[in-house]
Amino acid sequence: MPISLPRQLALGCLLLLLGAIFIGGEQPGAGNLFSTPWDKLVHLLVFGSIGVLVALGFPTLSLSAVLLAVAAAGAVDEMHQMFLAGRQAGIDDWLADLAGGLFALPVISRLRLLYVACAVNKKAR
């Protein structure tokens, strides 16, 4: 069974975002793009977006599995930074990543309800 276009778009955006984090994070000066506390807001927004994209790309995943995926992506990102010159891993950054995943959960729930409502409405026609 082919993957629907919305899922393909979500998965494509997810891969692009993860690639931007890991490849972009290796660039000189990447660790100085955002000063404290704005860097935590960026972590929250980026990893919240990852959560939404994971949920859209894998619609059968539970919310806890989506949160676990966000936590894992954040942990891998922080571990990756341990090996980069001028970068450092931080539990505070990972907690901001996790907070982004948590804040995304109500958005994901709402998107799923809208999807079900649209599917029921389409079926009723």
Task: Show the residue positions of the predicted features.
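Short helix-capping/hinge motifs at transmembrane helix termini and TM-loop junctions
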Residues: G25-P28, P59, A85, R112
